[in-house]
Design a protein with these regions (language model features):
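Catalytic cores of enzyme domains
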Residues: 30, 78-277
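Non-catalytic, usually N-terminal nucleic-acid engagement modules in DNA/RNA processing proteins
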Residues: 1-81
Length: 277
C-alpha cells in the first residue's frame, strides 16, 4: 500500500469524511507568513482532512433560531458542530503528522480552529484554502469551502509535510451558484457578506471568486449580541467597525452575555447554504 493510501486509511479510521493532498506550489498566492514553507520550510505537500457536521446537529441550530424554537438547542451545535469535531480533527492531524515523522518526513499539524492573530482575524494557515487546493471543495461566495456533498457544513484541518505525495486535482466547475442564489448575503444578520465586492484567487490557472467578507462586522456583531442566539444584549454596531471597536464591545459586554457567548455563535452562512445535505 502506498503512502497516500496509508494516510487516507488512517484518516478514515478516525471518522474523517474528506481527505486530499495539495502541492505547496498551489499556495504561492497566499499572504506572506501564511504559506506552507513560511511555517515548515521543508514542506512539499499539504494534507487536507474534513469532517461533516451531522444533519441532526444542523437541525438543532435551525431549531434554536426559529421563532418557535428552543434557543438552548444552540448548545448542541456549539458542542457537536464545533468542539467535538475540532477535537477529532486535531487528534487526526496529530496522528497523521506522527505517522509521517515515523516514516522519516518532517510534518507540522495545523490547529483546526482558533485564529492566531485576533487583531487581524487571521489564522496562521487557512484550512479552507487547503481544502480547495487539495481538490476537496470550491469556494462559496460566503468565503467558505463548499463541498458537493455537505455544502459548507464541513470542518477542516491541515498537515504540512516534507513528504512528496501525489496531489489530487482541483475540482472542475463551480459549486456555489451566484447567479441564482444570494442566500448567504440575505441571511447575514450584520451584513458582513457584501453583495458585489469580491476577492479573486488563482490556483494553477483556475480563478476563484468570493466575497470580500467584512470580518470585523462578523466578529463584532457576535460580541454585540446582534447575530447570536443566546444574546442578552444588543449593542449598536458601527458602520465600519475595526479592531478597536471589537475591544470596545468586549468592554461593554454584559455579564450574562459574556457567560453565554461561548455558545452564541451565529453560523447562518453555514447552516442556511442550500448546497449539499
Amino acid at each position: 500500500m502506498g503512502l497516500k493510501n496509508q494516510l487516507r486509511n488512517l484518516a478514515e479510521k478516525r471518522s474523517s469524511d474528506f481527505f486530499g493532498v495539495a502541492p505547496v506550489s498551489r499556495f504561492k498566492g497566499a499572504p506572506k507568513f501564511h504559506k506552507p514553507r513560511d511555517i515548515l520550510p521543508e514542506s512539499k505537500s499539504v494534507l487536507s482532512v474534513g469532517i461533516k457536521i451531522p444533519q441532526g446537529v444542523r437541525k438543532a441550530n435551525h431549531r434554536s433560531f426559529s421563532k418557535k424554537g428552543m434557543r438552548d438547542a444552540i448548545f448542541i451545535y456549539q458542542m457537536h458542530g464545533y468542539v467535538t469535531i475540532n477535537n477529532k480533527l486535531n487528534k487526526t492531524a496529530y496522528s497523521l503528522a506522527n505517522f509521517l515523522e515515523n516514516q522519516g518526513f518532517v510534518s507540522t499539524p495545523i490547529p483546526a480552529s482558533a485564529p492566531s492573530n485576533r487583531k487581524d482575524l487571521v489564522g496562521i494557515f487557512s484550512n479552507r484554502h487547503a481544502a480547495v487546493a487539495a481538490g476537496q471543495a470550491n469556494f462559496g461566495w460566503n468565503t467558505l469551502a463548499i463541498t458537493e456533498e455537505a455544502g459548507p457544513r464541513v470542518r477542516w484541518v491541515s498537515v504540512l509535510t516534507s513528504a512528496d505525495i501525489h496531489p489530487d486535482p482541483l475540482l472542475k466547475g463551480d459549486i456555489c451558484d451566484r447567479e441564482d442564489c444570494n442566500k448567504c448575503v440575505e441571511v447575514c444578520p450584520v451584513e458582513a457578506i457584501p453583495d458585489t465586492e469580491s476577492v479573486e484567487l488563482t490556483m494553477e490557472g483556475k480563478k476563484f471568486v468570493y466575497s470580500n467578507l467584512i470580518k470585523e462586522r462578523c466578529r463584532t456583531g457576535g460580541v454585540s449580541g446582534l447575530s447570536t442566539r443566546m444574546a442578552e444584549q444588543k449593542l449598536e454596531l458601527p458602520t465600519n467597525p475595526g479592531p478597536e471597536d471589537y475591544l470596545k464591545a468586549l468592554d461593554k459586554e454584559s455579564s450574562w452575555h459574556k457567560m453565554e457567548r461561548i455558545a452564541s455563535m451565529c453560523g447562518r452562512c453555514i447552516i442556511e447554504c442550500p448546497v449539499g445535505s
